[in-house]
Amino acid sequence: MKNITVIGAGTMGNGIAHTFAQRDFNVNLVDISADALERALETIERNLDRMVKKETITIKDKIATLSKITPFTDITEGVKNTDLVVEAATENVELKLKIFKKLDELCNSDTILASNTSSISITKIASVTNIEDRVVGMHFMNPVT
């Protein structure tokens, strides 16, 4: 597994993208809002700057991490050739079901689909897909580390 897509560039999404990128995964960060993507990348860079200041990473590590994240406003492009999708959209059941229906249409049958939901049934989310056995819950706590 090398390519990961994160859906949603808010607090959780940018933290998840940062964490995967820092661990050398290629990360596509998808959001319908270009402004949200810009804010997410700024937040990630600010967090990396703090890590450089604390000497927990080097500037080279920061640059490498940022180079691993590619922003997309188009979900179709953002999920191409991905091994894992982590959905971190707003905690809204209708929205999440809509996203998973779309992911089911767009992703390869071997792509793992994960939701960061804290309250919605994974079984319910999986039920809108044709690959129920590849839908999982992957709940991250804030801050993501």
Per-range role (PLM):
Residues 25, 80, 143-145:
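Acidic/polar active-site rim loop that often engages polyanionic ligands
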Residues 40, 99, 103, 125-126:
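Hydrophobic packing residues within well-ordered alpha-helices of enzyme cores
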